[in-house]
A protein has these predicted regions:
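N-terminal targeting sequences that direct proteins away from the cytosol to non-cytosolic compartments
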Residues: 1-73, 138-152
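Conserved polar/disulfide-associated segments of primarily extracytoplasmic proteins
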Residues: 57-134, 138-145, 150-152
């Protein structure tokens, strides 16, 4: 191989310095908390809420259509003016699900609250003074959290 050239030897400290700088940046990034964590907020939309439950807002969450991730259970909300509350609850469940068929099953009614379940997906509508508030819950705690939804 031979003796390294002088030019090669001059660039070695620069390469080592660049490696040290990039290593320091990477190490600092790994040690510091992620400042881009999604904010946490109370699960409430329109006239529907789950008292005492605060979850991380999902990417794409807006004031008009908030979204939360509650330890693997996703919650979506929307306010819509509708005439037929039962039909609208079925349509909302279908829209949040993966199928195209209209969901069957009985809608549970409790005052202004309607609940329809299909596996790990639950749709809830709550009538308020204005538009009807809809919530969808999907995931391992969907049924449990659906029981906690109340009129705000």
């Amino acid at each position: 191989m031979g003796i390294p050239s002088v030019e090669y030897m001059k660039s070695t400290p620069l390469i080592l310095a660049a490696g040290a700088i990039f290593g320091a940046i990477y190490g600092t990034n790994a040690l510091l908390p992620d400042i881009y964590d999604n904010p946490t907020s109370e699960v409430q939309a329109g006239s529907a809420r789950i008292p005492g439950l605060s979850c991380a807002e999902e990417d794409g969450s807006t004031t008009a259509e908030p979204r939360w991730d509650c330890d693997g259970t996703q919650i979506r909300a929307k306010k819509v003016g509708v005439q037929d509350k039962d039909q609208a609850t079925r349509r909302y469940l279908r829209a949040m699900g993966e199928g195209t068929a209209m969901p069957e099953g009985d809608i549970d009614r409790d005052g202004d609250k309607r609940t329809l379940s299909d596996g790990d997906l639950v749709a809830i509508s709550i009538e308020g003074d204005g538009p009807t508030s809809f919530l969808s819950l999907r995931g391992p705690r969907a049924e449990e959290l659906a029981q906690e939804v109340e009129k705000a």
